[in-house]
């Protein structure tokens, strides 16, 4: 069974992106094994602590390596993705063997889907920049993406209700992650 690893770019408990991820998990159902990466204990990338690798880094690299597909759900902060998500991707891009830049990293060639929920621009900028970064670190970014403009009323209730059209777009991305 295919293993899909969800990475939620927002740490907020009632994150709209977490809500989208939960909907995606429901869409996938039992057709794949879905798990969510907990990277809340990941230290900031610092070459002084890179080797030996911190326990959180080792755990995360193992989890990423064992997944078939990564699906990132990202908000947009000041026209980009969150700093803690960038930190995670920086760690994943680093060589496991010190200074051995010829050895593939755990994200090289990994298929990655990107979705995002945010303001009126539907995370267009953060998804574009994330696509650029992931391509640079040699991940295989799926062309199908979904950007969701969170309606004004949801900002007051912390509840995101997807439209039928958004649900269909989410299903289309889910199908690409499964196949």
Predicted features and spans:
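Helix-loop-strand module that forms the ligand-binding subsite of alpha/beta enzymes
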Residues: 56-137
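A generic structural motif
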Residues: 29-35, 139
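N-terminal beta1-alpha1 ligand-phosphate binding loop
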Residues: 2-31
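N-terminal beta-loop-helix "entrance" segment that forms/cooperates
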Residues: 37-55, 154-159
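Glycine-rich phosphate/pyrophosphate-binding loop and the adjoining helix
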Residues: 5, 140-179
């Amino acid at each position: 069974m295919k293993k899909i690893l969800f990475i939620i770019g927002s740490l907020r408990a009632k994150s709209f992106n977490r809500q989208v991820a939960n909907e995606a998990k429901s869409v996938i159902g039992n057709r794949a094994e879905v798990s969510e990466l907990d990277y809340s204990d990941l230290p900031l990338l610092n070459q002084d602590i890179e080797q030996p690798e911190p326990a959180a880094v080792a755990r995360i690299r193992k989890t990423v390596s064992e997944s078939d597909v990564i699906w990132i759900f990202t908000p947009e902060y000041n026209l980009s993705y969150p700093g803690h998500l960038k930190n995670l991707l920086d760690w994943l891009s680093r060589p496991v063997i010190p200074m051995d830049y010829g050895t593939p990293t755990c994200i090289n060639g990994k298929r990655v889907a990107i979705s995002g929920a945010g303001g009126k621009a539907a995370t267009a900028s953060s998804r574009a920049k994330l696509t650029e970064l992931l391509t640079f670190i040699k991940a295989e970014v799926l062309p199908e993406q979904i950007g969701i403009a969170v309606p004004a009323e949801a900002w007051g209730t912390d509840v995101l209700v997807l439209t039928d059209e958004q649900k269909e777009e989410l299903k289309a991305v889910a199908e690409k992650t499964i196949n």
